[in-house]
């Protein structure tokens, strides 16, 4: 099972159950049936700081992915940590699904390009 730990630091209401379900659907479609994902909702200031720190771009963004590149075998019963997704509700507004899908696909190894776009199209 995919465990999704949600933290909302954005200061606005978020449909957390729908977001968790979407994360699970995308990962399931990618053949991931177990693991843990952090899903964090942040405000524009934190989004901007994270993008500046990690990508060198000084602007708020819709979503960021922080994959954990764990390919080593794990002991039985220990869940794989897939990474964290950070979403800024104030930037994405009602159109939060596409950026969330995009970020989750980064967690499973997709980079920008045709393969990513094809996978994103499956979740529209």
What does each model-found stretch correspond to?
Residues 1-99, 104-124:
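An acidic/histidine-cluster motif and surrounding catalytic segment
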């Amino acid at each position: 099972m995919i465990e999704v730990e949600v933290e909302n630091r954005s200061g606005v209401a978020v449909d957390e159950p729908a977001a968790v379900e979407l994360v699970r659907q995308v990962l399931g479609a990618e053949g991931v049936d177990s693991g843990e994902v952090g899903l964090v909702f942040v405000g524009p200031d934190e989004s901007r700081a994270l993008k500046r720190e990690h990508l060198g771009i000084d602007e708020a963004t819709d979503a960021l992915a922080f994959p954990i590149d764990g390919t080593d075998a794990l002991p039985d019963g220990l869940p794989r940590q897939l990474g964290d997704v950070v979403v800024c509700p104030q930037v994405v507004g009602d159109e939060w699904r596409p950026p969330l899908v995009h970020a989750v696909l980064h967690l499973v190894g997709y980079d920008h390009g045709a393969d990513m776009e094809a996978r994103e199209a499956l979740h529209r």
